[in-house]
Amino acid sequence: MNSIEFPLLDRTTQTSVISTTSNDLSNWSRLSSLWPLLYGTSCCFIEFASLIGSRFDFDRYGLVPRSSPRQADLILTAGTVTMKMAPSLVRLYEQMPEPKYVIAMGACTITGGMFSTDSYSTVRGVDKLIPVDVYLPGCPPKPEAVIDAITKLRKKISREIYEDRIKSQEENRCFTTNHKFHVGPSTHTGNYDQELLYQPSSTSEIIPPETFFKYKSAVSSYELVN
């Protein structure tokens, strides 16, 4: 099912010795043992729970759910992310060791869903908080779609160069350990906006309460971002 190919792993000699690179060997070991941290806040997470049963058996992909972010290399977000829960999500992502990956599952996680038009307390896309590797649309996505998303992530890992990923994340960081929110231009790229750096509380602009109600359209020029 959607076999993953390594171009450098098929060079064998007559003595059955495989020649490869350390990067490909590292990718192969990581994609075969993804340990997810399950971050479910709404009904989409119920569909992921179906994968634990014998019908879909997600253990065959090496997935071992963990309850600690320090033991996980994949965080799967499912459901609505509110402004109150956003700092907790960012903190969990920061505590995960490198390299780490994110799957956004469901319409509410990707765009805010039905709450994106008139809710002042909903994050309109989890990619405004953390970088997303795989988007899984649906309301809710079926278990088969979750398996397909995991397979696509494994393919991405197999073609990845570790040094390039670390460099890209270092150049696109906008969150800090104190997780303060402020008003700034919305981003839709899945990366951290370099211009939206956190300012100390002594110099940061005070956000009036009416700001939360002013910018509540689905596509607006300003969003609450981290």
From Swiss-Prot:
Cofactor note: Binds 1 [4Fe-4S] cluster.
Functional description taken from the UniProt entry: NDH shuttles electrons from NAD(P)H:plastoquinone, via FMN and iron-sulfur (Fe-S) centers, to quinones in the photosynthetic chain and possibly in a chloroplast respiratory chain. The immediate electron acceptor for the enzyme in this species is believed to be plastoquinone. Couples the redox reaction to proton translocation, and thus conserves the redox energy in a proton gradient.
One cellular component (GO) term of this entry: chloroplast thylakoid membrane
UniProt similarity note: Belongs to the complex I 20 kDa subunit family.
Gene this protein is translated from: ndhK
Cofactor requirement: [4Fe-4S] cluster
Superkingdom assignment: Eukaryota
HAMAP family on file: NDH1_NuoB (MF_01356)
Pfam families named in the record: Oxidored_q6 (PF01058)
Source organism: Cucumis sativus
Assembly description: NDH is composed of at least 16 different subunits, 5 of which are encoded in the nucleus.
Residues that coordinate or bind [4Fe-4S] cluster: C43, C44, C108, C139
NCBIfam families in UniProt: nuoB_fam, PRK06411.1
Name by which UniProt lists this protein: NAD(P)H-quinone oxidoreductase subunit K, chloroplastic
Membrane topology: Peripheral membrane protein
Main location: plastid
GO molecular function terms listed in the Swiss-Prot or TrEMBL record: 4 iron, 4 sulfur cluster binding; iron ion binding; NADH dehydrogenase (ubiquinone) activity; quinone binding
One GO BP: photosynthesis, light reaction
Location in or out of the cell: Plastid, Chloroplast thylakoid membrane
Key words of the record: 4Fe-4S, Chloroplast, Iron, Iron-sulfur, Membrane, Metal-binding, NAD, NADP, Plastid, Plastoquinone, Quinone, Thylakoid, Translocase, Transport
PANTHER family for this protein: NADH DEHYDROGENASE (PTHR11995), NADH DEHYDROGENASE [UBIQUINONE] IRON-SULFUR PROTEIN 7, MITOCHONDRIAL (PTHR11995:SF14)
